[in-house]
């Protein structure tokens, strides 16, 4: 994953490769927000629909119902902004080798959490700035860095 790879290299002052010149966006989500979404979903399991029609099936209301949710921050962040926050929190800047978009990569992705918000009241609570700060603190402690 990009956060760990970037943290590893930035913490050591090593150059990093930045795809799409850092312009693409991703939905960086703090782990506690993901856990919160999972727990909320577990506390609200899908229920069978007594009017389930086998001729016009809807798997979300069958006798074995399920729901699929996106869990994320619902706030896309440009990769370069994420890298800047890592550098700020590690207290150093590194050389960025800017690369073009790679084959098969997508310019922007983020989670639409509207169904999870509607069904279980999920709302991510950790802004990217706070999440990166906590991630770097954890990273330093875990890997014995100051």
Regions found by a protein language model. Name each.
Residues 8-146:
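C-terminal substrate-binding subdomain of Rossmann-fold SDR/epimerase-dehydratase oxidoreductases
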